[in-house]
Amino acid sequence: MSAYTSLNFLFLLTFFIGSLRVSAQLQDPTYVGHVCTNRISRNSIYFSNLQTLLTSLSSNNAYFSLGSHSLTKGQNSDMVFGLYLCKGDLSPESCRECVIFAAKDTRSRCPGGKEFLIQYDECMLGYSDRNIFMDTVTTTTIITWNTQKVTADQSDRFNDAVLSLMKKSAEEAANSTSKKFAVKKSDFSSSQSLYASVQCIPDLTSEDCVMCLQQSIKELYFNKVGGRFLVPSCNSRYEVYPFYKETIEGTVLPPPVSAPPLPLVSTPSFPPGKGKNSTVIIIAIVVPVAISVLICVAVFSFHASKRAKKTYDTPEEDDITTAGSLQFDFKVIEAATDKFSMCNKLGQGGFGQVYKGTLPNGVQVAVKRLSKTSGQGEKEFKNEVVVVAKLQHRNLVKLLGFCLEREEKILVYEFVSNKSLDYFLFDSRMQSQLDWTTRYKIIGGIARGILYLHQDSRLTIIHRDLKAGNILLDADMNPKVADFGMARIFEIDQTEAHTRRVVGTYGYMSPEYAMYGQFSMKSDVYSFGVLVLEIISGRKNSSLYQMDASFGNLVTYTWRLWSDGSPLDLVDSSFRDSYQRNEIIRCIHIALLCVQEDTENRPTMSAIVQMLTTSSIALAVPQPPGFFFRSNHEQAGPSMDKSSLCSIDAASITILAPR
């Protein structure tokens, strides 16, 4: 009986170990990150087309050997564009398994999403209502970093080595005729090698592939020992360890057709009549191992559940421990700014001063030192660290670190050489440096930055303080949205919020926010519209403008010019006729759509970016703006009834001088 029991137990144990082995062989793809935007109804035609597309992508075996496949389903506004891209060194079977898993994962991670991009180590899958896969300049990005930093003494040499390796990889991938995939390895030292991998979707031309990869490489922060950057049309990655199949002379070796069999454990032979003893010996060896495995799994699961619960219960906006790896020592910051010398002072923000600094590795930074006497500063400080640490976009200022010691609260940002937009925009001596081409580029960059906050980042973020002073310009006059102290994070399904404490800058605030504390993505859209009018005119919204014996702010003034058929009277005289008439009128039109009083009438940032980049898109007729100052001879028509409600409180929003 005991032998029978032992054999039963041995059978169950063998089954258990076999199950573990099968599970290991069928391991899920390694998740990296995803972007999910624009929820849609499950009852819509678009959603039905999406389900058909996902099924088609994951079931057509003919394309897995190519490693990539694109499809469209539906027509007109219900059309869905879809694509998958498997890593260039992946076997067709592994590619198939990853795509099937991704299609299923899509339905759980982004139920009802109109645009989605998910990345695994093995493959990428995405879909959208527009062809984002052939667009080499997109706001849909996934960026990840290795948490380990390069030592200061090795930083410059490391950066140069990685950049050189990535560029060579990009050239090789672009010139590839098939998968547009390349991997390279170089020796950084006698004991350390660097590894790089780049890939474009096969449908891109060589020129577009190079352009896409060059842009992605620019976004990588090489002071980390590893990182990757993904957009729908290309991706790049570097590490200090091999993460791809070994290569010979730059050619990727094909993976084996099937995995080699696991080595079998040889069973010792026993003399006849010793069967019982052999069973006991096998059990004595295997049982403790199996029990140890079970205990380890149980302990790991227990701690994992505790961590998950802790993460769920902790308010995200007050938790800066996740950014702990970004923390600077106060002495380092003090030395970098020469003890916060007035010679290094760049300006003053709402809660403190901003200084220029130079870190020990030679990197120039902007140091924002919050005032010690600011009662509101600590909350905004923690908020800014948590929000900005998770953002990676070319049109958003990069947070490099922070310092929180005793009473000191300091934020360390990348140094942007050309100061802020208002420095050029509202100074008659500097305005000439902003021709219309530059201003148009700035408008587009700001729009893409805000779109990333609203739609393409992992969090939905409302900036709440968008203004010319919070737009920094780099050496090439590219805009970077800054100052996230007022920003708020929205939940996935949240569309608006209320606050009793209205913060921000009067003149840029939307009516519903200034008067009722209600804010949403459309609040940022309103601020963006005001900012566009300032960029076009070179004038501040807070100033007073006289027209037909009546006064108003810049928004009101623009509306009257538009109504009178003379919108070009708004244009900054510093660039006179050096602009395209239709282009600038279209920008004024878009700005007026943004500042409409009814939030439902204001376009989304996604629509605004499309309006700016596609001249064929028809624009709606703008309605009167919020805070509309109506002159005595203007009558409130059907579209103006609601505007009159705002004129009562207008003086509390834009400071008026007595008449």
Curated annotation (Swiss-Prot):
The keyword rRNA-binding does not apply. The active site is at D465. Belongs to the protein kinase superfamily. Ser/Thr protein kinase family. CRK subfamily. The lineage of its organism: Eukaryota, Viridiplantae, Streptophyta, Embryophyta, Tracheophyta. The modification Phosphothreonine is found at T505. Glycans are attached at N175, N277. Residues 1-24 form the signal peptide. Involved in multiple distinct defense responses. May function as a disease resistance (R) protein. It is found in: Membrane. Interacts with CRKIP1 (KAPP), CRKIP2 and CRKIP3, three kinase-associated type 2C proteins. This is Cysteine-rich receptor-like protein kinase 5.
